[in-house]
Amino acid sequence: MSDYLENKFLDHFLGTASTSAPSAVYIGLHTADPTDAGTGAEVSGFGYARKSMAFDASSSGTASNSAAVEFSAASGGDWGTITHVGIWDALSGGNLLFHSALTTSKTIADGDIFKVAASGIDITAA
């Protein structure tokens, strides 16, 4: 969980400020750990854009993405080696909510497509 979301969670549930859910959340691809501060290297250029991602209701402390997500093909250059994903509250800019390393890094060359299967992303409250 990001520093931003930790603060929102604490403020909301301890009654010091209210917060509302984002209208949508987006998966972003990173070539380095975005860290809890949201400062790691996100892919940019060459046709890259975050993709909206829907989640099923949580069960036993875990929520999973409800549908597959497919990014557009890298166009005009390589995206590099994707090592982490982030879940963001905006299509661009915005606030990092969650982040995690991929089980296996994936190099995206010009023309390659990055896909996430349904239930391929699990967010667990620990």
Question: Language-model segments: which ranges?
Answer:
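Small cysteine-rich, disulfide-bonded extracellular modules of the LU/uPAR three-finger superfamily
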Residues: M1-V85, D89-A126
